[in-house]
Amino acid sequence: MLKVIFLSLLLINLGLAVETTHDPEFEKKFQVTHIKEGDGKTFPKKGDRVSVHYTGTLLDGKKFDSSYDRNSPFQFTLGVGQVIKCWDMSVARLSLREKIKVICPYNLAYGERGAGGVIPPKADLAFEMELII
């Protein structure tokens, strides 16, 4: 009986370890900070319609946009170029309700030109983002 309980607990722990495994190479490259763990099971795939709550800042902390201010998550189709590359890459790695902070290098954000007079040219950006659905 103890052997069955031990094996059951071991399998549960192994399952949890697999579900919460992160991509160390990606996390190092994009300086990912985990704020809240997600369910570890539900990941979006290319072509999925997703909803993300986010706050975007310049690296000096100046906020340029936030879905929280509008009380409405941002929706887009993952992996089809509707958002900056850093977003497609980051959101694809999030599980449901996971929240991270990620630093997006300018070449995977708004590039050499910046955007809308708010984001300067060659600006690396910081996003806190949470996958809602």
Segments the model singles out, each with a brief description of its role:
Residues 2-133:
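Cross-family detector of peptidyl-prolyl cis-trans isomerase
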